Regions:
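Conserved alpha/beta-hydrolase
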Residues: 100-119
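Short beta-strand/loop motif that positions the catalytic acidic residue
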Residues: 233, 239-241
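Hydrolase active-site cap/lid region
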Residues: 163-219, 228
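The serine-hydrolase catalytic nucleophile loop
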Residues: 86-98
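An N-terminal hydrophobic leader/cap segment in hydrolases
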Residues: 1-53
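Catalytic active-site module of serine/aspartate enzymes centered on a nucleophile-bearing elbow/loop
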Residues: 280-322
């Protein structure tokens, strides 16, 4: 019996430190990135792949998407740097490609060290990654025709945004989806929910985990507190969090939002969990946010009072049926606009993005939407 308890404790301990710095790796091939040359909305785009040396000396695999010179709407174009989650890769950012490109913005995606096809064994949930962002931003700035830069991160990538942005005035705006505020708080939550250790053992387990991670990765998890950077960060920002996030509780975004130092900030909450595909209306709002601040360069106070800019939007208040109807109507409108602006032969050559390339390749919400749609169809048939 005693041996079983020891074995259980050992498994719990290993599960926790691996959850922090060695989660399941996203394995893919270069073919999964799609064609290096493609047509989208009557423009020809190219994907260029780069190898950059990280702050710790690891090769980071990166990709940059931009229109060919004859198709550039402007000589200088802004760039969004997308930062992926802890067990994800640059494929996650490619899932946002359409929304970014149609806003006349270029996209740069990266596999952080320890992720995807990049070198390295461990991640650091934003600590080392924040120094890697500087390496990437320095590189992006040297690409001919590059304008302002925005950051878009999810989970680990969102925490990285928060840690880094205040250090660099070149970052003009940021979007953070599912960030954590304080890793000490998060670690205790993970121990209680996922590892399920007794309360008396939590403190001791975290101390052992801290020393293990410090030895393996040089990361002191007690210093991993994005919330310390929040008051110092001034760029316009959007926070996004699912209300049923089982990995990072949505209260972490509440905490960050409350102390965020920028005058223009918005918190969007939606139905779903950590890896649920975000509603299309949120993705569109993010796209418009980047367009306003990177392309139109709207000033913080233009056409808005501070009261209007500092809002929390609980997008889960309406019924799910109403939301799905709204999304379908908006998607149909977008489709009609695209059909008017594109030739049929060009549409056949448009970039084909794998459905699995949307946030962490998980679409848990699709089944729920289909069920509701089937119910509505049955009601319509009965009425007829």
């Amino acid at each position: 019996m005693e041996n079983k308890e020891k074995e259980k404790s050992k498994m719990s301990y290993e599960s926790l430190w691996k959850l922090v710095i060695r989660p399941e790796r996203d394995n893919y091939t270069i073919k999964d990135l799609g064609n290096p040359k493609f047509t989208f909305l009557s423009r020809t785009y190219t994907r260029k792949d780069y190898d950059l040396l990280s702050s710790e000396g690891y090769i980071m695999k990166c990709s940059f998407f931009e229109p060919e010179i004859p198709f550039r709407p402007k000589k200088t174009m802004p760039v969004i740097l997308y930062l992926h989650g802890n067990s994800s890769s640059r494929l996650e950012g490619i899932g946002m490609l359409r929304e970014v490109l149609k806003r006349d913005i270029n996209l740069f995606v990266v596999d952080f060290p320890g992720s995807g096809l990049s070198e390295g064994e461990y991640i650091s949930l934003g600590y080392h990654e924040s120094y890697d962002v500087k390496v990437i931003v320095d590189f992006i700035e040297k690409i001919p025709g590059t304008g302002d830069i925005g950051l878009w991160g999810r989970s680990m990538g969102a925490a990285t945004c928060m840690i880094y942005a205040h250090r660099d005035e070149r970052i003009k705006c940021i979007v953070m989806d599912s960030p954590f505020a304080d890793f000490n708080v998060l670690a205790k939550e993970l121990v209680l929910k996922q590892i399920k250790l007794p309360n008396l053992l939590i403190g001791g387990a975290l101390k052992i985990v801290r020393m293990t991670i410090l030895k393996k990765n040089g990361l002191d998890i007690e210093k991993l507190k994005p919330i310390d950077s929040a008051p110092k960060t001034k760029q316009p920002a959007i926070f996004i969090h699912a209300v049923s996030d089982e990995l990072i509780n949505n209260k972490h975004s509440d905490m960050l939002f409350a102390v965020y130092g920028g005058k223009e900030k918005k918190l969007l909450k939606c139905i779903g969990n950590h890896n649920t595909r975000r509603p299309s209306r949120i993705i569109r709002e993010v796209g418009q946010f980047f367009y306003d601040h990177l392309v139109n360069k709207v000033q913080n106070n233009n056409n808005k009072s501070n009261e209007e800019a500092n809002n929390i939007f609980n997008l889960d208040l309406n019924s799910e049926e109403d939301k799905i109807k709204e999304e379908k109507e908006n998607e149909n409108q977008d489709l009609n606009k695209n059909n008017e602006n594109s030739q049929n032969n060009e549409e056949k050559n448009e970039i084909k993005l794998n459905n699995n390339q949307i946030i962490d390749h998980k679409e848990e919400s699709i089944n729920n939407e289909q069920k509701i749609e089937n119910k509505e169809n049955k009601k319509d048939n009965n009425n007829q």
